[in-house]
C-alpha cells in the first residue's frame, strides 16, 4: 500500500512539474511572436524606419546556417522548450 501511494505521489509530481517545462511546436508567425516576446520585454508593432537595418538576432545569416541546426530545426520540426527558444536570444 505504501509503495502504491509513493508511486501516485511521484507520478503527480512529475506531471505537475513537467507542465512548466513542456515541449511545444513553434512555427511560422507563432515562432516569430514568441521570440519577440521572449527576447524583447515590450513587443511593439514594427514601423518602417524604426527597425530599418535591424535583423532578427536568433536567425543566423543564410550562408552560415547551411548544414547547421537552427531554431526551425529544433522547434518547428520537433517540439522544444522555452529554455531552448531563449538560447537564441541575443544577450
From Swiss-Prot:
Gene3D superfamilies: Insulin-like (1.10.100.10). GO terms for cellular component: extracellular space. Residues 47-67 form a propeptide. It is found in: Secreted. GO terms for molecular function: growth factor activity; hormone activity. Keywords: Cleavage on pair of basic residues, Disulfide bond, Hormone, Pyrrolidone carboxylic acid, Secreted, Signal. It comes from the Eukaryota. Residues 1-19 form the signal peptide. Disulfide bonds join 27-76, 39-89, 75-80. The modification Pyrrolidone carboxylic acid is found at residue 20. Silk worm has two kinds of PTTH: 4K-PTTH and 22K-PTTH; there are many forms of 4K-PTTH. Brain peptide responsible for activation of prothoracic glands to produce ecdysone in insects. Belongs to the insulin family. Heterodimer of a B chain and an A chain linked by two disulfide bonds. This is Bombyxin C-1. The lineage of its organism: Eukaryota, Metazoa, Ecdysozoa, Arthropoda, Hexapoda.
